[in-house]
């Protein structure tokens, strides 16, 4: 059985190869065709409609912390007006505006322990098996670890609803608005990628 490091290296290589092949195929044939458009539209409608255009992220860096081989940049950025996402950016030593590195966004697990969010993949809390962001930073990747809605710093701001109760509340709030949590999660993921793309 491969070690975690060997597994990450092999899956990263496999994912890169797959992405390269998909890019080559995408350049030769359109992703959306007359045949696929109706399904695509139904799927989008079922999720809650089109996502808003990405606006200014208004990033704020809160603090920096040095670790062995990389630094943690605690930050937040705007997802939608009035909704900010706390996140941790892991930057390997030696990476700068002039010496860049590949970047990836990693989300925490979604299996019950709602108090945990970005700090688990960043290697600061929780199960070491899930410290994937820290492992990738040690391999030279810039890693963004954001909090998903209802986790860690994005739990009930009034502190009335805990864990799953707040998640059910948010689920119903989006459903009543004609959307769903998947729509919101995809929007948040898109904004995380917008943040990574905005870096030098």
Roles of regions detected by a PLM:
Residues 56-96:
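N-terminal cap/lid segment of alpha/beta-hydrolase-fold proteins
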Residues 99-109:
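Short beta-strand element of the alpha/beta-hydrolase
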Residues 35-52:
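Alpha-helix capping/hinge segments and adjacent helical runs
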Residues 1, 21-38:
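C-terminal segment of N-terminal export signals and the immediately downstream linker at the start
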């Amino acid at each position: 059985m491969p070690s975690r490091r060997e597994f990450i290296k092999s899956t990263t290589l496999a994912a890169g190869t797959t992405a390269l092949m998909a890019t080559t195929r995408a350049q030769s044939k359109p992703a959306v065709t007359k045949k696929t458009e109706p399904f695509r539209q139904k799927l989008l409608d079922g999720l809650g409609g089109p996502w808003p255009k990405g606006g200014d992220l208004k990033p704020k860096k809160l603090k920096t912390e040095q670790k062995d081989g990389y630094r943690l940049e605690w930050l937040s950025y705007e997802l939608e007006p009035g909704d900010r996402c706390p996140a941790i950016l892991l930057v390997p030593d030696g990476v700068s505006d002039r010496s860049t590195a590949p970047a990836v966004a990693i989300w925490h697990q979604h299996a019950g322990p709602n108090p945990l969010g970005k700090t688990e993949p960043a290697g600061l809390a929780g199960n070491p098996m899930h410290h994937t962001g820290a492992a990738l930073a040690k391999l030279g990747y810039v890693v963004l670890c954001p909090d998903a809605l209802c986790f860690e710093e994005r739990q009930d701001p009034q502190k009335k609803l805990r864990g799953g109760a707040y998640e059910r509340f948010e689920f119903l709030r989006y459903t009543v608005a004609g959307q769903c949590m998947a729509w919101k999660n995809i929007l948040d993921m898109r904004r995380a990628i917008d943040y990574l793309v905005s870096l030098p």
